[in-house]
Amino acid sequence: MIWKRHLSLDALNATSQNTLVAHLGIVYTRLGDDMLEAEMPVDARTHQPFGLLHGGASAALAETLGSMAGFLMTRDGQNVVGTELNATHHRAVAQGTVRGVCQPMHLGRSSQSWEIVVFDEQGRRCCTCRLSTMVLG
């Protein structure tokens, strides 16, 4: 297991109360040895005007996952902030739920890079993101 902080899924989800994460319906669903996973509904909260998943919602899911994964890689007195997010959208999603899977690409002392892949309910890749974070403290 790569994580330096050990929180339960309930504790991770509790951090989302009264935030954009909760408003979008994002829920952490799995914390593996080297991955963090969350789901987000595709509904009126996350649609763009044409009834499809908004690219910004996919980006918010990705940044949520990467930032929390980055936080889990810090020690007491440290935190992380996102410095760059890149998203490539591959496929439209009109309804259902999407699942984001976050894994590390680089874990340095002062910077981290995370790959977040968003899948539809059929397991098809919808979006590929990369989040860079800076470790503070």
From Swiss-Prot:
Keyword Cytoplasm: yes
Subunit text: Homotetramer. Dimer of dimers. Interacts specifically with the aryl carrier protein (ArCP) domain of EntB.
EC category: hydrolase
Annotated localization: Cytoplasm
InterPro entries: HotDog_dom_sf (IPR029069), PAAI_dom (IPR003736), Thioesterase_EntH (IPR026576), Thioestr_dom (IPR006683)
Functional description taken from the UniProt entry: Required for optimal enterobactin synthesis. Acts as a proofreading enzyme that prevents EntB misacylation by hydrolyzing the thioester bound existing between EntB and wrongly charged molecules.
Keyword rRNA-binding: no
NCBIfam families (alphabetical): PRK10254.1 (NF007607), unchar_dom_1 (TIGR00369)
Domain of life, per lineage: Bacteria
Name of this chain's protein: Proofreading thioesterase EntH
Keyword terms of this UniProt record: Cytoplasm, Hydrolase
Pathway in which this enzyme or protein is active: Siderophore biosynthesis; enterobactin biosynthesis
One of the record's GO molecular function terms: 1,4-dihydroxy-2-naphthoyl-CoA thioesterase activity
Family membership: Belongs to the thioesterase PaaI family.
GO cellular component: cytosol
EC numbers on record: 3.1.2.-
Active site: E63 (nucleophile or proton acceptor)
